[in-house]
Structures are given as structure tokens and as C-alpha cells.
């Protein structure tokens, strides 16, 4: 696999030099300064690409070309944003970039309630606390009909949790959930956030699928024409939240996805940390079944807690994910492609490392501190080498 690393551009506290020293060769990045929906010009793409190459690295994957909210709701200028998206793909292809990761999550990107959950060893991780999230929905946001999403026991627990919160706790939880995360343009006040949610109140999962299908049928033929692989990222967490439709969460969703738009350019980002939150997702089976459509891998593990809807991000080779067999399946697919003359390795990045060691004293992007990902990348490098020696390079 190609060892890659997410970089948030020139303002990222982790420099390109740091990344090269970590052993990565590919950069996963985006033009975060360009507003969602606007065309990425060839000039801007080349400028970023040159910056990366001057550091001895290559721009391996775009993550992400954001999908404008009006595309997701099919309102306003959605056709304009789709046409802009097509032009961005053409421009990326002209600059030699061949893989684009994106998501179709409504309103929010990945969602956590705690961005600095302290583990027993003193390192810090991202965490999603189901009851804390319920307290936010029911008593802070006060989302209409939110009680329908929770049973009586959960509602009582959420009330108890909320009653113990200080004003500072409320502010911090709200900020964690709605203020936006690295790489995301959106950041909302509570009122603005509810307004965004209201735009989806009449969009069922079935209707939302028709919106995704329309987007795929517009975009994927262009990607196929210009030689770009589109790699959709799953919902994170992979279940409905905030009354929003979530439609990239299960193996059944993956099957619908490839049947809806069967062109080879239409593929997946295998994010083990997102899919792996659900105990009913068999990650090895998912990887094997859709191996020929996996164009990018986010390798990360999560640990479900006593409440199975609560989880925290585990060390990369620990937790609930069968990382050994997932990586083995990815390597099996990579060797199949190589035997058919495809030289493009599957780009892989260590996702969401723990904040640890010297990074505990630094300001870092949540989940994207250097040392935790350095550790994860080294572990995956070792796992890959061992798998190759035992199973592939006999």
C-alpha cells in the first residue's frame, strides 16, 4: 500500500518535512481555502501540488472536494454546484491527480462529543458518548421530536447527565459537536445549526438516496472519462443522528451504491474506524466483497464501551477492528491488481492518532496530531511487511 498522510495545508502544525520524516510518501489534502462549491482552478491545484513535490512528496489523494449542501438537499443552485464539481474533477485530472475522497453526510462531517478523552496511559483520544449526545439533542439544542430517537431509559440518563453539567461543560459539548472540525468549512451557532437541520426535515433516507443517485449519475461519468477514481467515505458514526438521513453506513448501503452507478470510477474509501463502530458491520467481509472498488483506505480502530452506542478511538492495532485481516484483504486486492498490470498502489493513511508525548503540550487538530499517527503508520508498515513475507512473497 502507498503510505499516505493527511495534511491540512500550510496552516497545519504538522509540516511536510515532518510528514516525510514519518516515512509517508503520499499526501492527502485539499484546497481548504476555496469555499465549498467553487471551482478549484488549475492554477491553485498546481500551486499546492508544486509545494508538496518540492518537499519530496506527491499529492496522492484529494480529501475532500466537498459536496455543497444544496446538492445534498437538491435545492437552490444545486445544478451549478454539480457543474462546478465536474470542472474541478477535470482540472484535477489535468494536473495528474487521480483519486478523490468525498462524503455525502448531511450538515456535519464526523461527529464526536469529546475531543480530548484521557486514556489510562495519559494519551488523549476522540470519543462519542451516546448519552452526552442525547443530552445535547434533548436539553441544549432542544431539537423538535428528538425524544423519538431515544428510549425512556436513555432519556432519563440524558436528563441526569445534563443536570450535572456546568455552563462551561455545556459550552464545550456544544462547541465539540457543532463548531466544525479540521477541513470542514461549516461552523454554526445553535440557531444556525437548527436551521440547517430543518432543511432535511422532509428528506427521508429513501429520498436522500435519490439525491445521491442523481449526484453519482452526474459526476461519475465525468470521473470515468478523465481517469479519476471517486472514493465515498462512510457516515461517521454510521447511524442516523440528529434526525438526519444517513445512507453510507452498512454493507447493504455499499451494495446499493455500486448497483446505482456501476461505472468502475464509482468506489469507496474503506474507513475502518467509521464502519467499525457498528457491531453488525463485518469489516473483513465488506473489504473482500467490494475490494475492486476500494480506492483509498483510512485505517483506524474504535472501541465500543459498556453502552455499545458509545465508543472511543482505540490504538490503531487494538479495539474492535480486525485490522490484521482487513489489511490482508487490502493487500490481496493490491496483488490482484498488480497481476493485471495495474501499478497504482492503494493509498492508505493512519487515521486519527492519539495525542501523546510532546504533542500533549501543543495545539493540534483533533485527531490529527503528529506522534500518534507516526506510531500508527509505523505499526501498519510493520503489519504490511509481515503479511507480505508470510502470505504474498513466498
Curated annotation (Swiss-Prot):
Broadest EC class assigned to this enzyme: lyase
Catalytic activity, as annotated: D-mannonate = 2-dehydro-3-deoxy-D-gluconate + H2O
Keywords of this entry: Iron, Lyase, Manganese
Pathway: Carbohydrate metabolism; pentose and glucuronate interconversion
Single annotated GO MF: ferrous iron binding
EC number: 4.2.1.8
Stored InterPro entries: Man_deHydtase, Xyl_isomerase-like_sf
Keyword Membrane in record: no
Gene Ontology biological process terms from the UniProt entry: D-glucuronate catabolic process
Cofactor: Fe(2+); Mn(2+)
Gene3D superfamilies given in the database record: Divalent-metal-dependent TIM barrel enzymes (3.20.20.150)
Domain of life: Bacteria
Matching Pfam families: UxuA
Described function: Catalyzes the dehydration of D-mannonate.
Similarity-based family: Belongs to the mannonate dehydratase family.
Family matches, as PANTHER family: MANNONATE DEHYDRATASE
Protein name as annotated: Mannonate dehydratase
Species of origin: Haemophilus influenzae (strain 86-028NP)
Gene: uxuA
Amino acid at each position: 500500500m502507498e503510505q499516505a498522510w493527511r495534511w491540512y495545508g500550510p496552516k497545519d502544525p504538522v509540516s511536510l518535512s515532518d510528514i516525510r520524516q514519518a516515512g509517508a510518501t503520499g499526501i492527502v489534502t485539499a484546497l481548504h481555502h476555496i469555499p465549498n462549491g467553487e471551482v478549484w482552478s488549475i492554477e491553485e491545484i498546481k500551486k499546492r501540488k508544486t509545494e508538496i513535490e518540492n518537499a519530496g512528496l506527491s499529492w496522492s489523494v484529494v480529501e475532500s472536494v466537498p459536496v455543497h449542501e444544496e446538492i445534498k438537499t437538491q435545492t437552490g443552485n444545486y445544478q451549478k454546484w454539480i457543474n462546478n464539481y465536474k470542472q474541478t474533477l477535470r482540472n484535477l485530472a489535468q494536473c495528474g491527480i487521480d483519486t478523490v475522497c468525498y462524503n455525502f453526510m448531511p450538515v456535519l462531517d464526523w461527529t464526536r462529543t469529546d475531543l480530548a478523552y484521557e486514556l489510562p496511559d495519559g494519551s488523549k483520544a476522540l470519543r462519542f458518548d451516546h448519552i452526552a449526545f442525547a443530552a445535547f439533542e434533548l436539553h441544549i439544542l432542544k431539537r423538535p421530536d428528538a425524544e423519538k430517537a431515544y428510549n425512556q431509559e436513555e432519556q432519563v440518563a440524558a436528563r441526569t447527565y445534563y443536570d450535572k453539567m456546568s455552563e462551561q461543560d455545556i459550552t464545550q459539548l456544544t462547541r465539540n459537536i457543532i463548531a466544525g472540525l479540521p477541513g470542514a468549512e461549516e461552523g454554526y451557532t445553535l440557531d444556525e445549526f437548527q436551521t440547517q437541520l430543518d432543511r432535511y426535515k422532509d428528506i427521508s433516507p429513501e429520498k436522500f438516496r435519490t439525491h445521491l443517485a442523481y449526484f453519482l449519475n452526474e459526476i461519475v461519468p465525468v470521473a470515468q472519462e478523465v481517469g479519476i477514481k471517486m472514493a465515498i467515505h462512510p457516515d461517521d458514526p454510521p447511524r442516523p443522528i440528529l434526525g438526519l438521513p444517513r445512507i453510507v453506513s452498512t454493507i447493504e448501503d455499499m451494495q446499493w451504491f455500486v448497483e446505482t452507478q456501476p461505472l468502475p470510477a464509482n468506489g469507496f474509501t474503506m474507513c475502518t474506524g467509521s464502519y467499525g463502530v457498528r457491531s453488525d458491520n463485518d469489516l473483513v467481509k465488506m473489504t473482500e466483497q467490494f475490494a475492486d472498488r476500494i480506492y483509498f483506505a483510512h485505517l483506524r480502530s474504535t472501541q465500543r464501551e459498556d453502552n455499545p452506542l458509545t465508543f472511543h478511538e482505540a490504538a490503531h492495532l487494538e479495539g474492535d477492528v480486525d485490522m490484521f485481516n482487513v489489511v490482508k484483504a487490502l493487500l490481496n486486492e493490491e496483488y490482484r491488481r498488480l497481476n493485471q498490470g495495474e501499478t497504482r498502489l492503494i493509498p492508505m493513511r493512519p487515521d486519527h492518532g492519539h495525542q501523546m508525548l510532546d504533542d500533549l503540550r501543543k495545539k493540534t487538530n483533533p485527531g490529527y496530531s503528529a506522534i500518534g499517527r507516526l506510531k500508527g503508520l509505523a505499526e501498519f508498515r510493520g503489519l504490511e511487511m509481515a503479511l507480505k513475507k508470510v502470505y504474498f512473497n513466498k
